[in-house]
């Protein structure tokens, strides 16, 4: 712990952070539920939320539950990509009860919750003390309390803790607000997809733009889209680097795998001539309007058979198909190309396609804003903690 000051600090703070043992800050929490709380105050450690319906435990067993007061921390020993040996979570939602299988600690003094919620949860800070005070349990890692309390951590003054906690809470609130906006936009899109495309055999949708009343025409997807095998666009090297120019895509959820410096075998999609990459096995798909390469041949590249059709409308028609693959087989030729869909006039296609393009652009903008806020918080954590 040679470096005892963070890279970024508020004005007026210059003292080194003090090395403290966790035993100066926390003690083992042994409080049990003596009928203070019912099942509606059961806390989920995974999400730090109250489970008003409880967790399935009988009322008789609640007496064995641990009481988790506001400010207490619980050790959750499941490992993950983010937390290699488990993690601590701080109760900032109010007094409640939790499963007795989790180890909990209680502060020995008044401690700023907003600061410690972030600090004791931060893997780069907590990894070392957790590694040196856990053992492998039956279902997850278990905390050896005495060994943990003997570990040390660097701590700023209480006033600096308050400042840092206030800033990180502000960022968290911005992230939460933008996440709510994004979730709302996605729900709105789901609703529009349900109402602006025919369903249950109908030839017209429930919701239409003014001036359109004609029935939609039935077509097979194979009549709408041409497909191209992607073999010649497969990337040769998977040594990706963000400084390279050409994106490497997959039709799966991750979509962008990285960037390559290969200059041959590039699919030159453009805004004027986009394509859909269709995963032949999972049936996932993405709209692409920029040059790219791909990772594997397990997809089809789809383009319009009739360029007078609106591409974005047809893409959303494809995305709106409710189909869950039941086996590991290719789906475009054998199944999807035979699916019957409905298409309206070119003018109505244009209206609907433009509407969903604008909506998707708005969703992408909010996703980008949310990503930048999370990156901003990550930077604060790296530079404001020691």
Predicted regions and their residues:
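Amphipathic alpha-helical segments with low aromatic content
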Residues: 1-18, 159-218, 339, 345-386
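Short, flexible domain-boundary/linker segments around small modular repeats
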Residues: 1-2, 123-159, 188-193, 199-201, ...
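Non-catalytic DNA-recognition/assembly elements of restriction-modification systems
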Residues: 8-32, 208-232, 243-255
């Amino acid at each position: 712990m040679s470096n005892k000051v963070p890279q970024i600090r508020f004005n007026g703070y210059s003292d080194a952070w003090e090395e403290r043992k966790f035993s100066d800050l926390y003690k083992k929490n042994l409080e049990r539920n003596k009928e203070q709380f019912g099942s509606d105050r059961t806390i989920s450690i995974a999400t730090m939320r109250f489970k008003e319906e409880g967790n399935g435990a009988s009322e008789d067993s609640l007496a064995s539950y641990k009481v988790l007061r506001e400010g207490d921390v619980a050790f959750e020993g499941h490992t993950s990509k983010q937390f290699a040996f488990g993690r601590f979570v701080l109760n900032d939602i109010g007094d409640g009860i939790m499963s007795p299988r989790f180890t909990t600690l209680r502060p020995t003094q008044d401690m700023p919750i907003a600061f410690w919620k972030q600090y004791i949860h931060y893997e780069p800070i907590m990894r070392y003390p957790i590694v040196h005070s856990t053992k492998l349990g039956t279902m997850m890692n278990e905390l050896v309390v005495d060994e943990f309390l003997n570990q040390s951590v660097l701590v700023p003054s209480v006033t600096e803790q308050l400042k840092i906690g206030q800033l990180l809470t502000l960022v968290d609130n911005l992230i939460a607000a933008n996440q709510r906006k994004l979730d709302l936009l996605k729900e709105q899109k789901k609703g529009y997809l349900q109402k602006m495309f025919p369903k249950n055999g109908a030839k017209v949708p429930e919701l239409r733009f003014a001036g359109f009343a004609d029935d939609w025409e039935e077509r097979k997807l194979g009549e709408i889209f041409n497909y191209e095998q992607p073999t010649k666009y497969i990337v040769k090297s998977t040594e990706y680097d963000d400084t390279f120019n050409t994106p490497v895509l997959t039709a799966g959820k991750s979509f962008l795998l990285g960037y390559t410096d290969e200059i041959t075998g590039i699919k030159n999609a453009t805004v004027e001539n986009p394509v859909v990459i269709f995963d032949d096995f999972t049936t996932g798909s993405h709209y692409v309007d920029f040059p790219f390469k791909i990772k594997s041949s397990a997809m089809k590249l789809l383009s319009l058979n009739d360029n007078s059709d609106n591409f974005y409308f047809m893409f959303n028609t494809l995305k709106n198909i409710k189909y869950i693959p039941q086996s590991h087989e290719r789906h475009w030729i054998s199944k999807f190309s035979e699916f019957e869909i409905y298409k309206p006039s070119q003018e109505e296609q244009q209206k609907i396609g433009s509407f969903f393009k604008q909506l998707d652009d708005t969703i992408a903008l909010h996703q980008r804003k949310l990503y930048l806020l999370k990156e901003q918080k990550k930077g604060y954590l790296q530079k404001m903690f020691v």
